[in-house]
Regions:
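A binding-site-centric feature that preferentially detects glycan-recognition modules on secreted/surface proteins
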Residues: 1-59, 65-218
Length: 218
């Protein structure tokens, strides 16, 4: 018996790809408005995410801007919008890179905005940081440069580990990274979590070399 195999021509209708333009999220920020682009870059390493943001012609989110974004996502009147829900999902599933470089020394921690996404690729020098802080302002012992981009929190002004929302908002390390207003916003944000937040850093012993780290929040 001869069996014939019939060839059937099947056609698959492929829909045209839908290109969704980026959505702009606007949140209150330091008396004005900050704008963020959705969808976000990543997931990827700190440097890769920063590079992608900069190549897109955008600015990387430093601590104060990140605090404003989170306040919008958790506390804002538009927090039920899909884009803000996505921010909360990222906080649960991964983390958000915060483009600040932190240099830990025995006496405390320096924080400087990482607007070029250098991360740990280039060292920071204590003398250079001190020069940046000259002529700046002081808030409860935490020093800020005139432009607000560099800060120093002395040991004793911060505690690494578990916090209450209230203690987080007053923590020197948090204030150095996110600013006074940003730290207050983070305190309000974490009060919605149902669990106490934790901060992580480096304890550098006397006589040891400084330790350079970057920031993230989750």
């Amino acid at each position: 018996m001869v069996t014939q195999t019939k060839n059937y021509e099947t056609g698959v209708v492929r829909p045209e790809p839908v290109i969704t333009p980026p959505t702009e999220l606007r949140v209150p920020h330091l008396g004005g408005t900050a704008r963020f682009v959705h969808p976000s870059q990543g997931p990827n390493a700190y440097g890769a995410v920063g590079k992608a943001i900069l190549e897109a012609g955008q600015a990387v989110p430093t601590g104060d801007y990140t605090a404003s974004l989170l306040a919008g996502a958790y506390l804002g009147t538009n927090r039920d919008e899909p884009e803000f829900k996505n921010v909360r999902e990222l906080m649960i599933s991964r983390w958000l890179w915060v483009f600040n470089r932190n240099l830990w020394i025995p006496e405390g921690v320096y924080s400087i905005e990482d607007q070029e996404s250098l991360g740990r690729s280039q060292p920071l020098n204590v003398n250079d940081l001190e020069n940046m802080l000259k002529g700046g302002k002081d808030f409860n012992g935490i020093r800020f440069s005139q432009d607000g981009r560099t800060s120093f929190a002395p040991k004793g002004s911060y505690k690494l580990g578990e916090h209450t929302p209230e203690s987080l908002a007053k923590d020197g390390f948090v204030i150095a990274n996110y600013g006074v207003e940003g730290a207050e916003k983070l305190g309000e944000v974490v009060s919605t979590f149902g669990r106490n937040p934790k901060t992580f850093g480096v304890e550098v012993a006397e006589g040891n070399e400084p330790e350079l780290r970057v920031s993230a929040v989750d």
